[in-house]
């Protein structure tokens, strides 16, 4: 047994060797994922939900909780919640309602948050999570419920950016009232040594699913997807769960894995030393450790009661069935089918998935390109452009249809690959459609034999020694003349045709 005192340099906490943890304890974890829905307006008012607006410019009496204001439920948010529940194999309840979650904090202007307590819209689901070894792990879903988001606090003056040690706190209420769906798993047992990886895989699968449903952009870096992880340990062979700690606002896939692993090691060190785990919330730090937050509240602390300003929600069976028809193929099943259709290896498919290119390649193929051509563009050149701009592939200012047009221009002999890249750069720069960029930049391949022959004659005259070598049978020397012609024509001549003309003129054709 190895307990390393102060093993976490940043936190100073004792950590138990990971192999010892999983040999002695069964980790039990649960995940609560908060997802901002991509609706145009907020959950209970008409304010915009645009990310990045000037602070406190997307607010009104309703989301500020001013006296006399009344909430009006966003129908689109309810429909998105139902679709999410269906995609998670949940039961959509015939009747649910909102409750007030009462607590006092600066980011809650009403001093309560409108949420759902004991009557959520979706219950008892599951998600088959694909793992890296091509197996799956079923994660049971306890509930998915609707609520409004809180405002955003920015703490100044502390080294960590958190409230501890801060001298000033700024509040932006633009986020207050943005529609949220909170997806809560049942306790996940039996994962053993794979617990951190399964936690990460679940959040990744959920992220892919919600993106496919087009209900959220699930940008963890922007806070539109946030994860809380509940972790506890119990001795192997026992039934009763241990005391859990809740790790708040874990904001990346890597952090989910790191947070679960660290917390297992921290709790393991306490338990083998005869200590007790405190029921508390903890903050995750990017250095890979957690620190104490506050004592964990219970449901009674929030004094839930039905919101008297909102009627119950009772989705009809007809509506639920209509929305069921809009649920697309699960993204990982779609990828497996696509991989078989394209005949590509697991490694190539993994690279496309990691680049976020699968759906873009598939859409390009639907627009007429071959899978090889589409992969070459999205998996190489366009990935480079996205990385240079520090954005994701789907944020590039080019569509799969436009990429397919570029591919067609190459196939038709109007562009070389090098010229096609310049056309794509023009599209990315906002210069117009591919054909227009080709014309405006004068990038079309030169196909006129008379123009190319004149350029060949000029190049041969400028380098008589090379011309003589070609006439003497050294056809490899034709490359120098081809290069000179390509330079003269700015790379727009058909190199293969230029070579044919050079050899013909020199009597080697």
From Swiss-Prot:
Domain of life: Bacteria
Disulfide bonds: none
This protein's UniProt keywords: ATP-binding, Ligase, Nucleotide-binding, Protein biosynthesis
Protein function: Allows the formation of correctly charged Asn-tRNA(Asn) or Gln-tRNA(Gln) through the transamidation of misacylated Asp-tRNA(Asn) or Glu-tRNA(Gln) in organisms which lack either or both of asparaginyl-tRNA or glutaminyl-tRNA synthetases. The reaction takes place in the presence of glutamine and ATP through an activated phospho-Asp-tRNA(Asn) or phospho-Glu-tRNA(Gln).
GO MF annotation terms: asparaginyl-tRNA synthase (glutamine-hydrolyzing) activity; ATP binding; glutaminyl-tRNA synthase (glutamine-hydrolyzing) activity
Subunit-structure text: Heterotrimer of A, B and C subunits.
Family: Belongs to the GatB/GatE family. GatB subfamily.
UniProt-listed GO biological process terms: glutaminyl-tRNAGln biosynthesis via transamidation; translation
UniProt gene name: gatB
Protein name per UniProt: Aspartyl/glutamyl-tRNA(Asn/Gln) amidotransferase subunit B
Catalysed reactions, semicolon-separated: L-glutamyl-tRNA(Gln) + L-glutamine + ATP + H2O = L-glutaminyl-tRNA(Gln) + L-glutamate + ADP + phosphate + H(+); L-aspartyl-tRNA(Asn) + L-glutamine + ATP + H2O = L-asparaginyl-tRNA(Asn) + L-glutamate + ADP + phosphate + 2 H(+)
DNA damage among keywords: no
EC number: 6.3.5.-
Source species: Mycobacterium leprae (strain TN)
């Amino acid at each position: 047994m190895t307990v390393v005192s102060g093993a976490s340099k940043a936190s100073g906490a004792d950590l138990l060797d990971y192999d010892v943890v999983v040999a002695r304890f069964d980790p039990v974890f649960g995940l609560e994922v908060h997802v901002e829905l991509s609706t145009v307006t907020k959950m209970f008012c008409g304010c915009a939900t645009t990310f990045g607006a000037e602070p406190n410019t997307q607010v009104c009496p309703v989301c500020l909780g001013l006296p006399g204001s009344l909430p009006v439920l966003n129908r689109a948010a309810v429909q998105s919640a139902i679709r999410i529940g269906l995609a998670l194999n949940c039961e959509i309840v015939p009747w649910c309602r909102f409750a007030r979650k009462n607590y006092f904090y600066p980011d809650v202007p009403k001093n309560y948050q409108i949420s759902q307590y004991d009557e959520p819209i979706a219950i008892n689901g599951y998600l088959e999570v694909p793992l890296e070894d091509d197996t799956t792990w079923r994660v049971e879903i306890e509930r998915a419920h609707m609520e409004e988001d809180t405002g955003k606090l920015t703490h100044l003056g502390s080294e960590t950016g958190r409230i501890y040690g801060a001298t000033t706190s700024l509040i932006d209420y633009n986020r207050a009232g943005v529609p949220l769906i909170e997806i809560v798993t049942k306790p996940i047992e039996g994962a053993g040594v794979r617990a951190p990886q399964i936690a990460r895989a679940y959040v990744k699968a959920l992220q892919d699913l919600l993106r496919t449903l087009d209900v959220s952009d699930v940008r963890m870096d922007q806070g539109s997807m946030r994860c809380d992880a509940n972790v506890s340990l119990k001795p192997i062979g026992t039934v009763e769960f241990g005391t859990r700690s809740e790790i708040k606002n874990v904001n990346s896939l890597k952090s989910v894995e790191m947070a679960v692993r660290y917390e297992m090691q921290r709790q393991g060190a306490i338990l083998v030393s005869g200590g007790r785990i405190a029921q508390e919330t903890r903050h995750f730090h990017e250095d890979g450790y957690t620190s104490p937050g506050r004592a964990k509240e219970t449901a009674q602390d929030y004094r839930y009661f039905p919101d008297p300003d909102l009627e119950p929600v009772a989705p009809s069976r007809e509506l639920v069935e209509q929305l069921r028809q809009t649920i697309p193929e699960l993204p990982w099943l779609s990828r497996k089918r696509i991989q078989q259709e394209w005949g590509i290896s697991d490694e190539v498919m993994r690279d496309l998935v990691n680049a976020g290119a699968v759906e873009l390649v598939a859409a390009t193929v639907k627009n007429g390109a071959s899978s090889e051509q589409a992969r070459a563009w999205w998996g190489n050149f366009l990935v480079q452009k996205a990385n240079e701009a520090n954005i994701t592939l789907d944020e590039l200012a080019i569509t799969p249809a436009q990429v397919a047009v570029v591919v067609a221009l190459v196939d038709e002999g109007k562009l070389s690959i090098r010229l096609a890249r310049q056309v794509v750069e023009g599209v990315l720069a906002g210069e117009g459609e591919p054909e227009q960029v080709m014309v405006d930049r004068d990038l079309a391949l030169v196909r006129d034999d008379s123009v190319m022959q004149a350029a060949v004659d000029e190049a041969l005259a400028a380098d008589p020694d090379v011309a003589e070598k070609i006439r003497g049978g050294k056809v490899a020397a034709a490359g120098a003349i081809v290069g000179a012609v390509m330079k003269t024509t700015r790379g727009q001549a058909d190199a293969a045709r230029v070579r044919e003309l050079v050899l013909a003129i020199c009597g080697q054709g």
